[in-house]
Regions:
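Sec/Tat signal peptide C-region and signal peptidase I cleavage site
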Residues: 18-22
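A short helix->beta-strand "capping" segment at the edge of beta-propeller domains
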Residues: 23-37, 205-208
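Hydrophobic beta-strand positions that form the internal "hydrophobic ladder"
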Residues: 48-51, 95-99, 140-143, 225-229, ...
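A flexible loop/linker signature enriched in serine peptidases of the S9 family
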Residues: 55-68, 81-88, 101-112, 120, ...
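Short loop/turn segments that connect beta-strands within beta-propeller blades
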Residues: 73-77, 115-119, 199-203, 251-255, ...
């Protein structure tokens, strides 16, 4: 697990800051934000030798955070640029390719793969909305992802035909959902997040989930490649249930859904064990208390034996990863420091 520790350390501090203009006042100013850069989203190669990460920078011209995929040896060395203007890199199971999200020549959201030996890049698909939660199938033949699909909305009234050359005001915005605005984004376009699959060699994405619900990643494939785990709140009153989600599986062939968890509260971030026998996930019971805490839970792949493994730990769990088939590593904050913990399947935390 030494590679995991190195990758997590890599993601923490700022990796670079562009030189600031010489000035007498060294107080951090608003403009200095555009000089900051940091490393994010590390991914270790299957052979444990290389770490991919996203180098984030803030563009003063567009007022946006931009991403570029870089790589660095696990043992240390000089980072090298892999792809500019891209993010969400994921290694293929054999380590020969990576998949990532970016923009195509028409500035549309797109998914690409890159052969790491030759540098050859192939566009897998163009999308109307951005792709998230990219995940390779175990055999490397498919890529799963989530993407927003515009919701169908009936107009409030039938508008008259607009004369040629007329300059009308924007159409009235009809809001009929409780969750219509978010901090940092403003008003939300009516859309729902769905799970898709696309051939890794390119093709037409196929939508697996249906209904007016958000289906969230990260995504995790079953070891036989027949189904995909994800989280969602598919209850009728989901918009008013802010602390509720369950884990589902969707059959890749038929699109049939099966509910894997049904506890009260949040259950998400499913991670299938290497042998496929268990599924780890984060859980947070919806109970009436002043403070909620996210824990590590595990359940057998057949749906039996659900357990909370970190209930005795007075810390909130962050990201989780399997360490073999008998333990789960997780991140947590402790008095201002980011730490890594390990919990065995019998609940021993170290």
């Amino acid at each position: 697990m030494r590679s995991l520790f190195r990758a997590l350390v890599l993601a923490g501090p700022l990796i670079a800051a562009a030189p600031l203009a010489a000035q007498d006042d060294t107080t951090f100013s608003a403009e200095d934000v555009f000089a900051l850069e940091y490393a994010d989203d590390p991914r270790i190669s299957p052979d444990g030798r290389t770490v991919l990460f996203v180098r984030r920078s803030n563009d003063i011209m567009s007022d946006r955070t931009e991403g570029a995929i870089w790589m660095v040896p696990v043992v240390g060395g000089e980072p090298r640029l892999v792809v500019d203007g891209a993010s969400q890199a994921e290694w293929s199971p054999d380590g020969r390719r990576i998949v990532y999200s970016g923009r195509d020549s028409n500035d549309r959201a797109a998914i690409y793969t890159r052969w790491m030996d030759s540098g050859q890049v192939q566009q897998v698909a163009s999308l109307d909305s951005g792709a998230s939660s990219l995940a390779w199938s175990p055999d490397g033949q498919w890529i799963a992802f989530t993407s927003n699909v515009d919701a169908e909305r009936k107009p409030l009234a039938k508008m008259p035909k607009k004369p040629e050359g007329a300059k009308w005001s924007d159409a009235v915005k009809v809001i009929d959902h409780a969750q219509f605005r978010r901090d940092g984004r403003g008003f939300l376009d009516p859309a729902f997040r769905h799970v898709f699959v696309v051939p890794a060699n390119g093709g037409t994405p196929r939508k697996l989930t249906q209904g007016d619900f958000d289906h969230d990643g990260p995504l995790s494939w079953s070891r036989d490649g027949r189904s995909i785990y994800f989280s969602a709140n598919r209850n009728e009153g989901w918009e008013l249930q802010t602390v509720e989600s369950d884990i589902y599986t969707v059959d890749v062939g038929s699109g049939a859904l099966s509910q894997f968890t049904s506890g009260s509260g949040v259950e998400g971030n499913p991670q299938v064990s290497p042998d496929g026998g268990r599924v780890a996930f984060v859980c947070m019971p919806n109970v009436k208390r002043p403070v909620w805490q996210i824990d590590v839970c595990v359940k057998n792949a057949d749906g039996s034996g659900a357990r909370n493994l970190t209930q005795s730990l007075d810390r909130e769990v962050g990201d989780i990863r399997w360490g073999g088939n008998r333990a789960i590593y997780f991140t947590f904050d402790d008095r201002g420091e980011k730490k890594i913990g390990r919990v065995s399947l019998d609940g021993r935390v170290t």
